[in-house]
From Swiss-Prot:
GO cellular component, one term: membrane
Annotated Gene3D superfamilies: 1.20.5.170, Hexapeptide repeat proteins (2.160.10.10), MurE/MurF, N-terminal domain (3.40.1390.10)
Residues at the catalytic site: 240 (proton acceptor)
Listed NCBIfam families: lipid_A_lpxD, PRK00892.1
Annotated InterPro entries: Hexapep, Hexapep_transf_CS, LpxD, Trimer_LpxA-like_sf, UDP_GlcNAc_AcTrfase_non-rep
Coiled-coil intervals: none
Pathway given in the UniProt record: Bacterial outer membrane biogenesis; LPS lipid A biosynthesis
Subunit field text: Homotrimer.
Molecular function GO labels: N-acyltransferase activity
Protein name: UDP-3-O-acylglucosamine N-acyltransferase
Reaction equation(s) it catalyzes: a UDP-3-O-[(3R)-3-hydroxyacyl]-alpha-D-glucosamine + a (3R)-hydroxyacyl-[ACP] = a UDP-2-N,3-O-bis[(3R)-3-hydroxyacyl]-alpha-D-glucosamine + holo-[ACP] + H(+)
PANTHER family per UniProt: UDP-3-O-ACYLGLUCOSAMINE N-ACYLTRANSFERASE, UDP-3-O-ACYLGLUCOSAMINE N-ACYLTRANSFERASE 1, MITOCHONDRIAL-RELATED
EC number: 2.3.1.191
């Protein structure tokens, strides 16, 4: 889908100050390095300012301070990145869903599907499910018994919702995601693992986004819960009974063990792992590849990852780590010897 807007229209949509001709047509978005005369770009990160002078964009989203020295056209805003985020939806080429149920879809007789919803080819909607207004269900999706997909939801092709999953409004779920699969619950009886039925569900709030191939397991007894505004990247594992607070974001490959609770407005970088049955308070940032083994009770930034080094230096550091226990014991012995000598009373020059 091709979209064309004038600079004047974009300025009005953003409440921006326009520096340049209102009638100039903009047909898309691009980076400072790649933008052409009919495209809009933005400068948000200072490290990219070096590309601004030679930028060929039709216009650039800029802060007032950067616009003063820029010879080209500009839309002057307080926060260029937020402005870019808003404008991006106007130029999104994603095909629009068409209301109705595809002839190849299988919809249970007692399922409720709003007339404005779109059900794609070969989708399955099971008994008791409810699909609300303006929902788009992509091809080959499976919506299990008694599921609810809230108003304005968008399920990409091949999303799976097991039974008893409740999804809020305007939720986006990408392909391959599985919501409500059975949690990893087993009881060990004399070395034999006995399966525990996972009889809870999953409850997801409004404005949540879930990435490609991410799994959110159903609760063992009560629901696994994802709060409003949560953003989950690709290939994340959310185990049974986990609770995630509003507006928390997680990058790819995070793994959260069962019954862990994460607060609001937290950020977990890529590859973070959390053990089960711990609590993370609000406003916590955890850096990439960190292993969280205990509860975090104070807001702030946390890390356990080892920073990159040249290989030879890393090998030396790894060898020293193995020696730390022995070195600590030797240091304690030296401290005892020093204490013994000093406590015995040494002669002074004053005699």
């Amino acid at each position: 889908m091709s979209v064309t807007m004038t600079l004047g229209q974009l300025a009005e949509a953003l409440g921006a100050t326009l520096k340049g001709p209102e009638a100039l047509q903009i047909t898309g978005l691009a980076t400072l390095q790649e933008a052409g005369p009919g495209q809009l770009s933005f400068l948000a990160n200072p490290q990219y300012r070096k590309y601004l002078d030679n930028c060929q964009a039709g216009a650039v989203l800029l802060k007032a301070a950067d616009a003063e020295s820029f010879a080209g056209n500009a839309l002057i805003v307080a926060d260029p990145y937020q402005a870019y985020a808003r404008i991006s939806h106007l130029f999104d080429p994603k095909p629009k869903a068409v209301a109705g149920i595809h002839p190849s879809a299988v919809v249970a007789e007692d399922a409720q599907v709003d007339a404005s919803a779109s059900i794609g080819p070969f989708a399955v909607i099971e008994s008791g499910a409810r699909i609300e207004a303006d929902v788009s269900i992509g091809a080959h999706c499976f919506v299990g018994a008694r599921c609810v997909v809230g108003e304005g939801g968008w399920l990409a092709p091949r999303v799976t919702l097991y039974h008893d999953v409740t999804i809020g409004k305007r939720v986006v779920i990408q392909s391959g995601a599985v919501i409500g699969g059975e949690g990893f619950g087993f009881a060990n009886e004399k070395g034999i693992w006995r399966k525990i039925a996972q009889i809870g569900g999953v409850t997801i709030g409004d404005d949540v986004e879930i990435g490609v191939n991410t799994a959110v397991d159903r609760g063992a007894l009560s629901d696994t819960r994802i709060g409003d505004g949560v953003k989950l990247d690709n290939q994340i594992q959310i185990a049974h009974n986990v609770q995630i607070g509003d507006h928390t974001a997680m990058a790819a490959c995070v793994g959260i063990s069962g019954s862990t609770r994460i607060g609001k407005h937290c950020m977990l970088a890529g590859g973070v792992g959390l053990v089960g049955h711990i609590d993370i308070c609000d406003n916590v940032f955890v850096s990439g590849m960190t292993m969280v083994t205990r509860s975090i009770t104070e807001p702030g930034s946390y890390s356990s990852g080892t920073a990159m080094q040249p290989l030879a230096d890393w090998r030396k550091s790894a060898a020293r780590i193995r020696q730390l226990d022995d070195m600590a014991k030797r240091l304690q012995q030296l401290e005892k010897r020093v204490d013994t000598v000093t406590s015995g009373g040494l002669p002074t020059s004053e005699g």
